[in-house]
Regions:
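Non-catalytic, peripheral interaction segments enriched in hydrophobic/basic residues
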Residues: 1-77
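Residue-level recognition of conserved structural "scaffold" positions that shape functional pockets
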Residues: 33, 48, 64, 90-92, ...
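Generic recognition of well-structured, leucine-rich alpha-helical segments
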Residues: 23, 27, 43, 52, ...
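Short, surface-exposed acidic
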Residues: 28-35, 101-103, 222, 229-236
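Flexible, low-complexity interdomain linkers flanking nucleic-acid-processing modules
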Residues: 53-166, 238
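Family-specific functional microsites
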Residues: 135-274
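Amphipathic alpha-helical surface "interface" segments used
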Residues: 38-45, 111, 115, 189
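Conserved aromatic-histidine-acidic binding/catalytic patches
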Residues: 4-8, 106, 156, 180
C-alpha cells in the first residue's frame, strides 16, 4: 500500500476512533479532536500504525538474510520505488530521530526493549503534534498537557461517576452546551439568562449574583481554576456546576412545568453527576 492509500484508510479509521473516544468522554461533537487524545492519553491512528510498522521493521531486519522477506526488504532498500513500504519506514524513523543505519542496534534488542523505545518516542512526537494543534483552538489552548503516558485522573478514578467525568471533560474544553458563550453562533443571545447582566460564560456562572443568592456559600468556596486542579478540586467544582445547571433548568423552565417551588433544586438520582 502506498502513502495515499494509507492516508485514505487512516482517515476512515480515525473517524471511527473519534466516535469511540467521544462516547467514552461524553465530548461535544465540536470538541477539537486533539483533546480526545490529550485527555485520554491515547495515540491517534496514524501514530498507532507508526508504532506497529516500526515493530514489523524490527522483525524483518532480525530475520536471516536468506529468508525471502528479508531479501525483498534488502531489494527495496537498495532500489526504492515511489510508494514502496521502505519509504514509509524511513519517514517513521526520521520523525522519531532514527535512521535505517540503526538496523544493527535494533537487531540486538528484544521486541519489548525496542517497543518501549518506539512507543516513548512516538508518544513524545504525538504530544508535540497535539499541543501544536491545540494552540490553534482558543477554547483549549491554555490547558497544559505534559505527557501521553496515562489518561487524566478524572477519567479513570473510582471516586467520580462517568456522568461527572463527562461534565468535567466538557467544562474543561468549554463545550458544555448550556452556556451560550461556548457556542455563540448557535445561540440567539449571549447574556446570562439568570442575571441578564454579563456574558453567559462558564466563568461567569460561578460569579452570577442569582446563582450566589440561590446556592450561597457552595459557590464561593470553589474557583474556576479547580477544573484544571487535582481530583478533589475537580469533584468540588463539578458538584457546584451540577447545581448551577439544575438551578438554571428550574428557573428557566416554562411556568407550570417545574417539579417543585420556583427556584428549588430537585434532587434526581437518575441525573446526579456525583
Amino acid at each position: 500500500m502506498d502513502k495515499s492509500g494509507e492516508t485514505h484508510i487512516n482517515a476512515i479509521i480515525s473517524v471511527i476512533d473519534h466516535k469511540i473516544l467521544r462516547a467514552i468522554t461524553g465530548a461535544h461533537p465540536k470538541t477539537p479532536n486533539e483533546m480526545l487524545y490529550l485527555e485520554t492519553g491515547e495515540l491517534d491512528i496514524p501514530n498507532v500504525i507508526r508504532v506497529r510498522r516500526l515493530l514489523y521493521w524490527q522483525n524483518i531486519v532480525s530475520r536471516h538474510e536468506n529468508e525471502l522477506l528479508r531479501k525483498i526488504y534488502e531489494a527495496m532498500k537498495e532500489s526504492p520505488l515511489k510508494g514502496d513500504w521502505i519509504n514509509m519506514v524511513k519517514e517513521d524513523l526520521n520523525k522519531i530521530g532514527m535512521e535505517l543505519k540503526h538496523e544493527e542496534q535494533v537487531k540486538q534488542m528484544t521486541r519489548k526493549e525496542f517497543k518501549d523505545i518506539v512507543k516513548d518516542k512516538v508518544k513524545k512526537l504525538a504530544l508535540e503534534e497535539f499541543n501544536n494543534q491545540k494552540s490553534n483552538h482558543k477554547k483549549v489552548k491554555d490547558i497544559e498537557h505534559k505527557s501521553l503516558n496515562e489518561p487524566q485522573e478524572y477519567l479513570t478514578s473510582n471516586k467520580i461517576m462517568q456522568k461527572t467525568s463527562c461534565l468535567l471533560f466538557n467544562l474543561r474544553t468549554k463545550c458544555q452546551k448550556e452556556f451560550k458563550e461556548n457556542f455563540p453562533k448557535q445561540n440567539g443571545g449571549s447574556m446570562c439568562p439568570l442575571c441578564n447582566e454579563n456574558q453567559d460564560t462558564q466563568e461567569h456562572a460561578l460569579a452570577c449574583k442569582v446563582v450566589a443568592q440561590k446556592l450561597g456559600r457552595n459557590v464561593t468556596e470553589v474557583k474556576y481554576a479547580y477544573l484544571f486542579g487535582d481530583l478533589e478540586e475537580q469533584i468540588k467544582v463539578c458538584k457546584v456546576y451540577r447545581d448551577i445547571l439544575k438551578l438554571r433548568t428550574s428557573l428557566l423552565a416554562p411556568r407550570g412545568t417545574q417539579d417543585g417551588p420556583t427556584g428549588a433544586i430537585i434532587p434526581d438520582p437518575a441525573t446526579s453527576y456525583v
